[in-house]
Amino acid sequence: MSWPRIGAYALLAFVAIMALNVTYQFLFRMLNKTRPPLVFHWIPFIGSTIHYGMDPYGFFFSCREKYGDIFTFILLGRPTTVYLGTQGNEFILNGKLKDVNAEEVYSPLTTPVFGSDVVYDCPNSKLIEQKKFIKFGLSQAALEAHVPLIEKEVEDYLAMSPNFHGTSGEVDIPAAMAEITIFTAGSALQGEEVRSKLTTEFAVLYHDLDKGFTPINFMLPWAPLPHNKKRDAAHARMRSIYIDIINKRRNAGDNVPEKLDMIGNLMQCTYKNGQPLPDKEIAHIMITLLMAGQHSSSSISSWIMLRLASQPAVVEELYQEQLANLERTGPNGSLAPLQYKDFDNLPLHQNVIRETLRLHSSIHSLLRKVKNPLPVPGTPYVIPTSHVLLAAPGVTALSDEYFPNAMAWDPHRWETQAPQENNKDDIVDYGYGAMSKGTSSPYLPFGAGRHRCIGEKFAYLNLAVIVATMVRHLRFSNLDGQTGVPDTDYSSLFSGPMKPARIRWERRAAKSG
């Protein structure tokens, strides 16, 4: 058989498959009234994957116009049911454990990165205990102690990094913020011993491990691809670094160092069944803490600096807010070192962070596997167990319905619009401390329900100290001829600005005010 004939048959087969697929979709809509509408697509298996992957929010808003808040699309062969709006957030993110499951969705992606027997590679009851263990580093006293550590890391970086050599220059801000935030997360959440190991080798390991979060690993987490080989080697090396620290302490009889850090805390922890936390799990929790503490902060701090560079007047407003509200007891009347209590007097700093989180949440989709058929209240729909549920809290955050002129970055909007992420009447305890479910709010930058980010207070504090410190020392502006901010890069699980994203910086004449 000649190649032209083979090509003709292949084309006919492809057309026939598409025709059958379109016919199936037509019959599905006509005959199956208990399923949400299926987003039209030409190619089976691929479905809407490309549109969703390139521009998830554009995809969500487009589908909402056609199908309403509830619809199903095909994501690499997997029926994925989206439920938008505050009711959708409540339905998915506050679903019962017996009905929805995060572990089955995320474990294939996260386990090779974080390690076994932690986070999504263990029963939810065990994860809750692990969250209790790490609250040591997230207590009020710990947060207060983190402030000078974070401030010092930022000041040291601005003083010594080649990115900020001299009195002015240009910088690829996502690259710089990635370095700053790994240092701040390491210093505050990991302790002095680990921070001292954040060398060039560790940075390379972190980068290789981070590449494990590429979206293809949802489908092929164990494929022998180059980035997966680097991921596995980086995980093994990083785990050995933590294990060496633990063994060194045990051999020296120093299980409880004079200055208790997170590793020392975890070495004392015991599960409810009486089992001490194994060293392997300590290492894996430490890896998780480092990556979780750095990821969102890196992306959001980059967006903050890009937004400030696009509106230099706001940079000066922030600086003047510090001069007007903080003590000036430093040398020559300069601003004093930052303290935790200072941020109660810096509302614009908080609003800049809040507004940037609203527009630039680093995770656009939150997924849950359906475990039991789920009736959707107020609709004829029943979601079958073959589906994955998808919540997109960022959709309400980007909707004019809740935030007038929603696509504009305006920190001052929060002066008249109360933050709705915490409702005192919506408090629940999932086993690791009382917190707001948050599912009824249109603003959920850290998720909601039992999987709401436990480290959001640290994230806010980390960002606030970074922003306040950088504003004290630097002015920012866009490069000549540039306006606005870069587009969003959705190629990774954690979205961020398209790289490189360069801005201009200028050092202030007085170092601290």
Swiss-Prot record:
List the top taxonomic levels of the source: Eukaryota, Fungi, Dikarya, Ascomycota, Pezizomycotina
Q: What class of enzyme is it?
A: oxidoreductase
Q: Which cofactor does it need?
A: heme
Q: What residue stretch is flagged as signal peptide?
A: none
Q: Which organism is it from?
A: Aspergillus flavus (strain ATCC 200026 / FGSC A1120 / IAM 13836 / NRRL 3357 / JCM 12722 / SRRC 167)
Query: What would be one Gene Ontology cellular-component term for the protein?
Result: endoplasmic reticulum membrane
**Principal place where this protein is found?**
endoplasmic reticulum
**Cellular localization per UniProt:** Endoplasmic reticulum membrane
Q: What is this protein called?
A: Sterol 14-alpha demethylase
Annotated coiled-coil positions are none
Which reaction(s) are listed as its catalytic activity? a 14alpha-methyl steroid + 3 reduced [NADPH--hemoprotein reductase] + 3 O2 = a Delta(14) steroid + formate + 3 oxidized [NADPH--hemoprotein reductase] + 4 H2O + 4 H(+); a 14alpha-methyl steroid + reduced [NADPH--hemoprotein reductase] + O2 = a 14alpha-hydroxymethyl steroid + oxidized [NADPH--hemoprotein reductase] + H2O + H(+); a 14alpha-hydroxymethyl steroid + reduced [NADPH--hemoprotein reductase] + O2 = a 14alpha-formyl steroid + oxidized [NADPH--hemoprotein reductase] + 2 H2O + H(+); a 14alpha-formyl steroid + reduced [NADPH--hemoprotein reductase] + O2 = a Delta(14) steroid + formate + oxidized [NADPH--hemoprotein reductase] + H2O + 2 H(+)
Q: SUPFAM superfamilies given for it?
A: Cytochrome P450 (SSF48264)
